[in-house]
């Protein structure tokens, strides 16, 4: 009970002083997942100390005479260092989350386009202990505390922008062209996040879906900038490494209990599988459900377990925390990626499966439509339904997809029974992703936009 009380205490303190409740709790979950309660309390203390330091320095600025050297020894009126051509990529380079992958792959794209860049870990050394998970990331030497480039590209979501300014200080925003490279999973951009628009000069949207959502909320330029998808071919692991059977076609489905389960719709995926293959003794196919966040959301986990048939040996639940290499190996070892999502901002999981040449069965709605089509994917029909209040933040007035289970069942049967079709779809998928979402292709778009703004 003591640890729970401690957690509630630091959480309340964070919300009271740190701003942005949805962002705060997501950050708390991330810290606690890897560092436990003691790490969580330590992180809160560091943040609070940093905030007090910033507030103190701001107060001091109000009484410092012009030209007078302040306590740091720097003259506030001294000429500033010239800004270099290129961009500073700000985000969570060690984060084991989608936005962490976002900044890492952007670095690859900037490098491929030969655009000068640096990387800034917004929260200092947060996540540094996770560096070994990202052994394939070749730009760790680019991560520094300083970086004076003409452009800043923020690889975080809009709800983190104000908090990022508190951590980084206002100077890093000054005299730079600030770009928010944001994600969002619903069709209407939250009104509560519009203050973030005051901190940027333009927004880059990873998909047309996000582009439209944000463009409806601002007069700032909103530019569609696709995400890069590339990684070393995973090898050295087998199905046995994950305890998976070798004698059947395996569907793969991902979701995280800390990231709003209803959006990913695991119940729909399992229901479709059981309708497609109703005979429990039919060993031609199985479905692997890769889960994260069970320890942080035990009630949701138990409710999910009770909602499915755990006695069916064809439904395989994986709850082990995997490295990036292991995750991609798992995708490679399965036969089809299933995503009966209700909405996706982009859909990196789908894109990575396609990169590996896997047939993808996915809801034909939202961000994934930028790279999934009838020639390279199995797009499932849907109808729009209201998002209920408890299902996602800022749900009021929003709608998302309810995928057609019968249509998904038809595709699932086809990829199992028609090997040629599955292989053809998978090959078209790999060709598309490697052509249009390679670091060089995406980097060319980055360079083109920054050049148009005279920033490179």
Over which residues does each language-model region extend?
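N-terminal pre-catalytic "stem/leader" segment of glycosyltransferase-like enzymes
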Residues: 3-151
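Extended catalytic core of nucleotide-activated donor transferases of GT-like folds
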Residues: 67-78, 88-90, 126-213, 326
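Conserved catalytic-core segment of nucleotide-activated headgroup transferases in glycan assembly
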Residues: 101-104, 108-109, 117, 231-324, ...
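Aromatic "clamp/platform" in nucleotide-sugar-dependent glycosyltransferases that forms part
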Residues: 342
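Short hydrophobic beta-strand element within catalytic cores of glycosyltransferases
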Residues: 359-362, 378-379
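A short, well-ordered alpha-helix in the C-terminal region of glycosyltransferases
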Residues: 407-410, 414, 421-435
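C-terminal alpha-helical cap of glycosyltransferases
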Residues: 439-456
């Amino acid at each position: 009970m003591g640890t729970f009380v401690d957690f509630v205490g630091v959480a309340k303190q964070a919300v009271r002083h740190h701003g942005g409740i949805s962002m705060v709790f997501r950050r708390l979950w991330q810290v606690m997942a890897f560092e436990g309660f003691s790490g969580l309390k330590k992180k809160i203390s560091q943040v609070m100390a940093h905030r007090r330091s910033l507030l103190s320095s701001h107060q001091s600025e109000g009484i410092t005479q012009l030209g007078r050297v302040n306590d740091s020894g720097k003259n506030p009126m001294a000429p500033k260092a010239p800004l270099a051509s290129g961009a500073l990529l700000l985000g969570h380079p060690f984060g084991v989350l989608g936005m962490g992958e976002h900044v890492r792959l952007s670095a690859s794209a900037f490098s491929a386009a030969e655009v000068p860049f640096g990387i800034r870990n917004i929260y200092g050394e947060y996540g540094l202990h996770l560096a070994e998970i990202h052994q394939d990331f070749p730009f760790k030497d680019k991560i520094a505390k300083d970086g004076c480039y003409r452009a800043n590209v923020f690889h975080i979501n809009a709800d983190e922008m104000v908090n990022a300014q508190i951590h980084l200080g206002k100077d890093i925003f000054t005299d730079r062209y600030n770009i928010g490279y944001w994600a969002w999973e619903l069709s209407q951009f939250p009104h509560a996040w519009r203050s973030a628009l005051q901190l940027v000069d333009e927004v880059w949207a990873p998909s047309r879906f996000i582009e439209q959502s944000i463009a409806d909320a601002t007069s700032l330029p909103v530019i569609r900038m696709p995400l890069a998808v590339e990684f070393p071919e995973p090898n050295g692991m087998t199905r046995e490494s994950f305890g998976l059977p070798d004698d059947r076609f395996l569907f793969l489905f991902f979701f995280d209990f800390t990231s709003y389960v209803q959006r990913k719709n695991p119940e729909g995926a399992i229901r479709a599988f059981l309708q497609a293959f109703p005979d429990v003794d039919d060993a031609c196919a199985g479905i692997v459900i890769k889960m994260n966040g069970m320890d942080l959301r035990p009630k949701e986990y138990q409710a999910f377990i009770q909602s499915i048939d755990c006695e069916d040996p064809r439904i395989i639940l994986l709850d082990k925390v995997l490295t990036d290499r292991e995750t991609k190996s798992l995708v490679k070892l399965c036969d089809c990626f299933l995503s009966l999502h209700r909405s996706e901002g982009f859909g990196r999981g789908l894109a990575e499966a396609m990169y590996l040449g896997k047939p993808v069965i996915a809801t034909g709605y939202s961000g994934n439509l930028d790279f999934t089509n009838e020639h390279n994917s199995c797009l499932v029909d849907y109808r729009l339904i209201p998002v209920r209040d408890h299902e996602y933040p800022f749900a009021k007035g929003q709608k998302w997809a309810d995928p057609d289970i019968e249509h998904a069942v038809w595709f699932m049967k086809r990829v199992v029974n028609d090997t040629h079709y599955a292989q053809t779809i998978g090959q078209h998928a790999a060709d598309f992703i490697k052509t249009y979402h390679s670091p060089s292709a995406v980097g060319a778009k980055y360079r083109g936009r920054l050049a148009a703004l005279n920033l490179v």
